[in-house]
Amino acid sequence: MKTREEALALDRDDPLAPLREQFALPAGVIYLDGNSLGAQPRAAAARAQQVIGAEWGEGLIRSWNTAGWFALPRRLGDRLAPLIGAADGEVAITDTISINLFKLLAAMLRHQARHAPKRRVIVSERSNFPTDLYIAQGLIAQLDRDYELRLIDDPADLPDALDDETAVAMITHVNYRTGYMHDMPSVTQTVRQAGALMLWDLAHSAGAVPVDLNGALADGAVGCTYKYLNGGPGSPAFVWVPKRHQRAFEQPLSGWWGHRAPFAMQPAFEPDPGIARFLCGTQPIVSMSMVECGLDVFAQTDMHAIRRKSLALTDAFVALVESRCAGQPLKLVTPRAHHQRGSQASFEHPHGYEVMQALIARGVIGDYREPRILRFGFTPLYTRFVDVWDAVETLRDILDTEAWRAPEFATRAAVT
């Protein structure tokens, strides 16, 4: 892709192009931040009005039954399941990634304590998204045994970090900063052969790349719905536990929604035999209902078509940045190899924050991550090839004119 006309031609031939019309995208904005917050499905506003106005406003408490609120976490989990290689009854929409990670990590450590008490080490990556590490650190602090969080600095170091003391490997499939993607089947096999349990974070994978959790024989996973799945800001996350583990994994947040018969109101906790045991308290129905609007769009295509366009978009973006912005201090930190790349492209720049603020001021929305990383997410459901061209041209102009040096672009916002 060497001209804007070529980009427009690619858009005309794009089989996913009609899906863009199902998103409410503001005019004059090129949105390359779907890896942080997905765009709003057009159906979401009407769905919100239905939930608030009719189901809550008129149905009141009856809607737990008549509108299907009570079954929503499991029903939506079943709809999400095909996107991550899961079966019906293995996914629940609930809580946040951090909370679900706490549940699963604690359940896995408890399981190992019963069957292999010597295993007290959690292996993860130093470059993992911080909340994953914070949750592990906090959980270890609560335990009355000598647990350890062991961090590796390179994916190649994982085999050497695994030993007969490893309980769980907690790995994020696609790195939030660089977009590096692990080989899920290979990593899972390595971890399981070492006698450890494999816990995946799919925050930057679900809805972005094909995932096959059951095919890889993973042991558990968490993910969010507000990025590529377009569930809305703060929409509830998801937890996946394969059926072979569901009765054996006992999560610590034993709230009433995880009980086998919540309305029996028994004084002693008896966990649900299935995925519902990973629920805790009453669910956020309004925000959870919005998740279905994003899933409705995914139902009109498949992850392989999404992946093909994702790679084409990121290939084009990287090539254009390196040709149109040649001579600028930009360093690609995202892998070039397709099998190692998620659905984003990240570049390092000495003044990355200021450059990103200048881009946003001109209607090209990406985001910034420390240290010095310009991060661009590509969501094939609504990102066009002409968006790629126009974004790079805007970046080139900002760098050539040094427009990023304007004082207002150096002011740090609370959210970057």
UniProtKB/Swiss-Prot annotation:
InterPro entries: Kynureninase, PyrdxlP-dep_Trfase, PyrdxlP-dep_Trfase_major, PyrdxlP-dep_Trfase_small. Keywords: Hydrolase, Pyridine nucleotide biosynthesis, Pyridoxal phosphate. Its cofactor is pyridoxal 5'-phosphate. Pfam families: KYNU_C. Pathway: Amino-acid degradation; L-kynurenine degradation; L-alanine and anthranilate from L-kynurenine: step 1/1; Cofactor biosynthesis; NAD(+) biosynthesis; quinolinate from L-kynurenine: step 2/3. The modification N6-(pyridoxal phosphate)lysine is found at K227. Pyridoxal 5'-phosphate binds at I97, S98, F129, P130, T131, D132, T172, D201, H204, Y226, W256, T282. GO terms for cellular component: cytoplasm. It is an enzyme of class 3 (hydrolase). One of its GO terms (molecular function) is kynureninase activity. Homodimer. PANTHER family: KYNURENINASE. Catalyzes the cleavage of L-kynurenine (L-Kyn) and L-3-hydroxykynurenine (L-3OHKyn) into anthranilic acid (AA) and 3-hydroxyanthranilic acid (3-OHAA), respectively. NCBIfam families: kynureninase. This is Kynureninase. The lineage of its organism: Bacteria, Pseudomonadati, Pseudomonadota, Betaproteobacteria, Burkholderiales.
